[in-house]
Amino acid sequence: MALAKRIIPCLDVDNGRVVKGVKFENIRDAGDPVEIARRYNEQGADEITFLDITASVDGRDTTLHTVERMASQVFIPLTVGGGVRTVQDIRNLLNAGADKVSINTAAVFNPEFVGEAADRFGSQCIVVAIDAKKVSGPGEAPRWEIFTHGGRKPTGLDAVEWAKKMEGLGAGEILLTSMDQDGMKNGFDLGVTRAISDALGIPVIASGGVGNLQHLADGILEGHASAVLAASIFHFGEYTVPEAKAYMASRGIVVR
């Protein structure tokens, strides 16, 4: 039997408010994270991802208090990321109620941190977030590069090779965001999603660019992702999680 594919609403949190931008800029307020998380829990979301988007840039720690409040209201797996740099950061988030912790910038500066975290807490707790941007030109073999610091700093790292390295170090999941598509609402970058999903044995969560329900299904059917993540289409009431699940089921995708 095929494993059910997950639908994951994503809360990008900036100074305690859920926000949504386009290509990591032009931020728009979407509300209180705990209220929004509770709504998705009631709608039947499979998981929730909470990313403190100010954390890495400002060098401050993820808001543990918000995570505690959210975990007390939400009874589905909660992944939290943003500014996670140390084993103690991970322990604090898990103690606050996170089920999984997402590591992004710190993995690039210290890849062994991912291995240490997986050894300490188990691979099932460790998500590596990858922000990728296409860097190949027309007529060239497609190539995507890893960027850090909310998509501001190029690293020179090849996204597919990097994802393989993270899997080898013990990451349990990859959260893949296409920076070219983020907030654009014209679909995932299916090329990079498929390239990484096909190269790995661990689940890949597709993120960045969902504008309609067909895009969610495409992430699974064409991108070969194990889960699809979206923000704007849910936050601003365009679609509900049950509508998304019904549409995906109508396309032959197994959902919970």
Swiss-Prot record:
Belongs to the HisA/HisF family. The lineage of its organism: Bacteria, Pseudomonadati, Pseudomonadota, Gammaproteobacteria, Pseudomonadales. Pfam families: His_biosynth (PF00977). This is Imidazole glycerol phosphate synthase subunit HisF. It is found in: Cytoplasm. Heterodimer of HisH and HisF. IGPS catalyzes the conversion of PRFAR and glutamine to IGP, AICAR and glutamate. The HisF subunit catalyzes the cyclization activity that produces IGP and AICAR from PRFAR using the ammonia provided by the HisH subunit. It comes from Pseudomonas entomophila (strain L48). GO terms for biological process: L-histidine biosynthetic process. Its EC number is 4.3.2.10. Keywords: Amino-acid biosynthesis, Cytoplasm, Histidine biosynthesis, Lyase. GO terms for cellular component: cytoplasm. GO terms for molecular function: imidazoleglycerol-phosphate synthase activity; lyase activity. InterPro entries: Aldolase_TIM, His_biosynth, HisF, IGPS_HisA/HisF, RibuloseP-bd_barrel. Its main location: cytoplasm. Gene3D superfamilies: Aldolase class I. It catalyses: 5-[(5-phospho-1-deoxy-D-ribulos-1-ylimino)methylamino]-1-(5-phospho-beta-D-ribosyl)imidazole-4-carboxamide + L-glutamine = D-erythro-1-(imidazol-4-yl)glycerol 3-phosphate + 5-amino-1-(5-phospho-beta-D-ribosyl)imidazole-4-carboxamide + L-glutamate + H(+).
